């Protein structure tokens, strides 16, 4: 039997997850992330769930450096990537530009994300 302990995470949320302190930039280095995440074996799994209509809009949450966003955009889909870490988004934007892809990237906390229709 698994014994789980409930932890009060208010300190973490108020100290490290506010808009003034981007914890992701301290934890995640975009170059290291890319070096460690070169495998795209899971791309097939995600592509199976994509709509047949390539005009449909797709939202990728926690897109990081665009590991999945870019290959999906290359398939002709209109995809938007969202991430909270500025360095990850900068890397994703650079990679999209180098690939000649027009992809919208949004820096936001997905817990409070408010998108227009």
Regions found by a protein language model. Name each.
Residues 36, 62, 85:
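Anionic group-transfer/hydrolysis microenvironments
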Residues 69-112:
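Class I SAM-dependent methyltransferase SAM/SAH-binding core
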Residues 44, 65, 71:
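Glycine/alanine-rich phosphate-binding loops at beta-alpha junctions
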Residues 4-6, 10-64:
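Conserved class I S-adenosyl-L-methionine
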Residues 115-117:
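A short acidic, Gly/Pro-enriched loop at the edge of an enzyme's catalytic core
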């Amino acid at each position: 039997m698994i014994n789980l302990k409930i932890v009060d995470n208010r300190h973490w949320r108020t100290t490290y997850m506010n808009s003034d302190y981007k914890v992701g930039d301290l934890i995640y280095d975009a170059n290291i992330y890319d070096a460690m995440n070169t495998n795209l074996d899971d791309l097939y799994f995600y592509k199976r769930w994509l709509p047949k209509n390539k005009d449909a809009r797709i939202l990728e949450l926690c897109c990081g450096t665009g590991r999945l966003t870019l290959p999906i955009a290359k398939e002709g889909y209109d995809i938007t990537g969202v991430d909270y870490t500025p360095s990850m988004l900068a890397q994703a934007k650079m990679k999209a530009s180098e690939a000649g892809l027009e992809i919208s990237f949004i820096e936001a906390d997905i817990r409070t994300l408010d998108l227009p229709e």
